[in-house]
Design a protein with these regions (language model features):
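Secretory targeting signals
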Residues: 22-66, 73-75, 99-171, 202-220
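Juxtamembrane non-transmembrane "cap" segments at the membrane-aqueous interface
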Residues: 178-197
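Membrane-interface helix-boundary motifs at transmembrane edges
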Residues: 3-4, 95-96, 160-169, 236-241
């Protein structure tokens, strides 16, 4: 219980990350811009190509993701660092244990994303002359679903990578993948297939119908669940004693 409370407390570190970009503008005054546009730009960034404005999660806007990785990148893999054979000898069902850890990680991601996006939306409201409307809340909930899935998916990959390679290589591999997908997203702004498959690309998502957006979100969570299931199967067959052999 103490560990869970401590982890919840650590998530509060994202509030300065969410609010800091708006502080300088708050000291100057409000601007004539929609809350929706400011919110999308604050969270995702904006890439413009010709007459078409498309969105990808630009690298400079990934501080919230990096912070979550630093906080929870060893949430599961940390159990393998100190006498893992003794620790896991007391756990009869490895799959159930791993599934619970994934669920707890999901809960932290849900709370963390709410803090980050809530802080960002508050900052946008503080610097905009306009008020949030129906479209603002639509964008908020879409972004919220996306952020939770990305936090869970990438953090699970990092934890599994650290378990497999016994080092922080998993962290590096995950972030190399993120950067590569960012590059692909920018290089294929007008390709709907790549935009759909690539978890880091959201080209035209705000112009999609509810059904199309729902499919995209379901796809992202399918990836996260797939990684979780793979981790459960892998962990069930994993030889814990290998962790204690240098």
């Amino acid at each position: 219980m103490c560990r869970k409370v401590k982890n919840i407390g650590k998530t509060l570190l994202v509030l300065p990350v969410a609010i800091a970009p708006f502080l300088s503008q708050m000291s100057v005054g409000r601007i004539d811009g929609s809350v929706t546009g400011l919110f999308i730009g604050a969270v995702f960034g904006r890439i413009t190509e010709g007459d078409m404005s498309s969105l990808v999660i630009v690298i400079g806007k990934l501080a919230y993701l990096l912070l979550f990785h630093l906080l929870f990148g060893s949430y599961i893999s940390g159990h393998f660092t100190n006498m893992p054979s003794y620790y896991f000898s007391r756990i009869p069902h490895r799959c159930v244990w791993f599934g619970k850890q994934c669920f707890y990680l999901f809960c932290y991601a849900v709370w963390y994303a709410l803090l980050f996006l809530g802080g960002s939306l508050w900052g946008c409201c503080m610097i905009s002359l306009e008020k949030p409307g129906r479209e603002t809340w639509r964008c908020f909930f879409i972004t919220y679903a996306v952020c939770v899935s990305l936090l869970l998916l990438t953090t699970l990959i990092i934890n599994l990578g650290i378990i497999v390679w016994k080092t922080a290589v998993g962290f590096s591999v995950c972030w190399i993948g993120i950067i590569v997908m960012e590059i692909l997203a920018k290089a294929a702004l007008n390709n709907p297939c790549i935009s759909f498959i690539n978890p880091m690309s959201y080209s035209g998502v705000w112009d999609m119908s509810f059904g199309q957006v729902l499919i995209k979100i379901v796809y992202l969570y399918f990836l996260a669940v797939s990684v979780s299931v793979y981790g459960m199967v892998f962990f069930k067959k994993y030889d814990i004693t290998l962790r204690e052999v240098d």
